[in-house]
Amino acid sequence: MKFSRFGRIGLALAVSLGTGLGVTSCSTNHAVGYFYVTGSQYNQIGGFRIDNNLGNLTATENSPYASGGYNPIKALVANAGKFLYVLNAGCGQTGQSACPSGVPAANAGANISLFTIGGKGGLSFQASYNSQGNQPVSIQADSSGTHLFVLDSTVTDPTTCVGYVSSNPDTICGDITAFNIDPNTGRLSLITNQGVKNGNGTNLSYFPVGSGPINFVVVPSNSFIYTIEKGSGSALDPSQAVFVYANNSGQLALSQNTPIPTPAEDLTYIYASAKYVYLIDAGQNVNASGLILPYTAGTNGALQSLVGGQVPNSGTTSDPGPMTVDHQGKFLYLANQGPNLTPTSPSSSVSGFFIDPTTGRLTPLSGASSGTAVSFGAGSAPQCILEDPSNQYLYTANFADSTVTGAVINSTTGTLTTLRKSTSFATVGQPTWCVASGTLF
């Protein structure tokens, strides 16, 4: 077919105008971010592209990636999505089970692996680093992306622990190792403790916490770091308590004389939103499905319980795990890790709550009259839960069936509905954690 001169000009103008106005059938079908899953079965990281239209996940180029160590358990994205850090717990170290046969000695120790994130979500390994304690359990970064923290189960020198008794191993404390993050390369440099020295007069290379640390969180304002811990039960190290550090550009200082006791039976997770701090009590004496303990942060980081106190989780779930609050601060979602292994066992699910904008009080979604949370479907044994960078979708990565499960978030009601095309996506074996990185591509 041939066009006249005027026809060619008209066609060119139409194409130009359509392009300028963004009038194209696939204008919104782009990636809104990348989703990464750590898996312990093969020591891998699964990478996915998040589709804007449907929330579907498609593998990034060359995924999966080696985690840079053995037993990856946590990860985080820092510096506006430039860097991915993976915490490998290792094996065969103090207090750990023996390594499986065939694990190279170089991979047996715990480390933090640094990856750069490419334009299409691909990962490139850069370097690895070590925390200053034993058995790392979690990793966090401040909201500025300039400092990284690792929580270790035990210190290398127990004499630096407050309340340590040599005849009682339960009094060996944990620690937080702090690093500066280079904004250009992502490389880490250790921050020494300027407030505490060892018996030789040398500044510690870590910041001691209480005994039996379980998990920790940096509040969004970066002002405090809260660590939940089992504790030894002494006056200086109470059981089921929260250890508080004030954070000043990665330099940590005690802001409370002793850890803050809680009424919990079995603390398992902690999460901090812009306004509130939430603890999970997985104990079954009060409520078989666990409790949420909501707080505000007061003077010097002291936790003040919200009016109404603890909130029961859904009665049809078990093993309450990680949680997240949506970008509006309106809804809290809790991943229940019940394994879905038998028809009679409590099912894995997501509990949803509305957050009162004035009081912070949690109430179940959908106006349930029972006073317990409404539950939404999830894969088997979810280990993490997050909202995607476009604030449209909620995802969990599930240990028992090695999948990622997605749902659409109703921004008005908070209810979750299945993705329109596919709900479940296969990923690396035995997922342990998940993170997402936003993008404009």
Model-predicted segments: where are they?
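N-terminal secretory signal peptides that target proteins for export/translocation
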Residues: M1-R5
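Short helix-onset patch at the extreme N-terminus, typifying the N->h transition
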Residues: G7-I9, S273
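Bacterial N-terminal signal peptides
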Residues: G10-G22
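Predominantly soluble domains enriched in secretory-pathway, periplasmic, or organellar proteins
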Residues: G22-F441
